[in-house]
Amino acid sequence: MTRHLLAAGDLSRDDATAILDDADRFAQALVGREIKKLPTLRGRTVVTMFYENSTRTRVSFEVAGKWMSADVINVSAAGSSVGKGESLRDTALTLRAAGADALIIRHPASGAAHLLAEWTCGNGDSSDAGPSVINAGDGTHEHPTQALLDALTIRQRLGGIEGRRVVIVGDVLHSRVARSNVMLLSTLGAEVVLVAPPTLLPVGVEGWPVTVSNDFDAELPAADAVLMLRVQAERMNGGFFPSVREYSSLYGLSDRRQAMLPGHAVVLHPGPMLRGMEIASSVADSSQSAVLQQVSNGVHVRMAVLFHVLVGAEEIAA
């Protein structure tokens, strides 16, 4: 893969599989260690740039970097010169000049990660190519590491992804998670079904490698995995569905709907969950739910991504 991870669609099948395999290898390398430290990125500086609120993604990237012995520095809008009006470009160039090896960005603007990679790409000198850029979520565009950890969780639970039927349910329109999962899971050979009200499907979805349905119940009996999406009210201005109650009755994963799933099926959610709206608490806490497994896998996947963009070697340092 390239020295950046900007979109799930940029990953080949071999690239994605290598990251998933290395995520499993990192997890195994940490088993039994009293102190969870590997020397893999010793001497490297990783900077997280989060311009949107985050718990899971930010913490897992920080933990991933620290478990690999990198120096991890946090930059936020509130605590940096961004709060004084500094542009994203100037902040990026400052971090590049300061010697950052990797920039991990979450930003409300779609395409922000691509711009960051362009701005910091270096001056043509191969010894100074600029930092690697990892997209931790840009607007409604992409969230590639979330898709990777979802794929890893499905692979662990089901034994593989090829030929599996993955049903993605909810606010597809505003979901970068949905976009990245569609691209990655399709690349890995899964059959992807989108279930959403017509108002929460993006323009052009008919060109995606998916099947689209408005009938959640009809898709449950054949599902191998169900990925529930949060309704992103912060990106809406109203009018997408009549009421929370009606949305939940049509597109929420209730106990009744869980009973329609095959026994082997796995339930996923990228978080944060709106319990009682898109998913019942009893379902979220059930044995079919892999929500906490997703969080654990998030650390290992992000370790693998940092390894691939910064080192790119075949062997993980022990």
From Swiss-Prot:
Query: Family assignment?
Result: Belongs to the aspartate/ornithine carbamoyltransferase superfamily. ATCase family.
An example molecular function term from Gene Ontology annotations = amino acid binding
Q: Enzyme class, one word? A: transferase
Question: Its GO CC terms?
Answer: cytosol
This enzyme catalyses:
carbamoyl phosphate + L-aspartate = N-carbamoyl-L-aspartate + phosphate + H(+)
What HAMAP family does the record tag this protein with? Answer: Asp_carb_tr
Which residues are involved in binding carbamoyl phosphate?
Answer: R56, T57, R106, H143, Q146, G271, P272
What's the protein name? Aspartate carbamoyltransferase catalytic subunit
Q: Which GO terms describe its biological process?
A: 'de novo' pyrimidine nucleobase biosynthetic process; 'de novo' UMP biosynthetic process; amino acid metabolic process
| EC number(s) per entry | 2.1.3.2
Q: What does this protein do?
A: Catalyzes the condensation of carbamoyl phosphate and aspartate to form carbamoyl aspartate and inorganic phosphate, the committed step in the de novo pyrimidine nucleotide biosynthesis pathway.
Q: Would I find Electron transport among this entry's keywords?
A: no
Please report any disulfide bonds recorded for this protein chain, giving both cysteine positions: none
User: Which pathway is this protein assigned to?
Assistant: Pyrimidine metabolism; UMP biosynthesis via de novo pathway; (S)-dihydroorotate from bicarbonate: step 2/3
What organism does the UniProt record list as the source?
Answer: Mycolicibacterium paratuberculosis (strain ATCC BAA-968 / K-10)
Indicate the quaternary assembly.
Answer: Heterododecamer (2C3:3R2) of six catalytic PyrB chains organized as two trimers (C3), and six regulatory PyrI chains organized as three dimers (R2).
Record keywords: Pyrimidine biosynthesis, Transferase
Q: Which residues cross the membrane?
A: none
Binding positions (L-aspartate) = K84, R176, R230
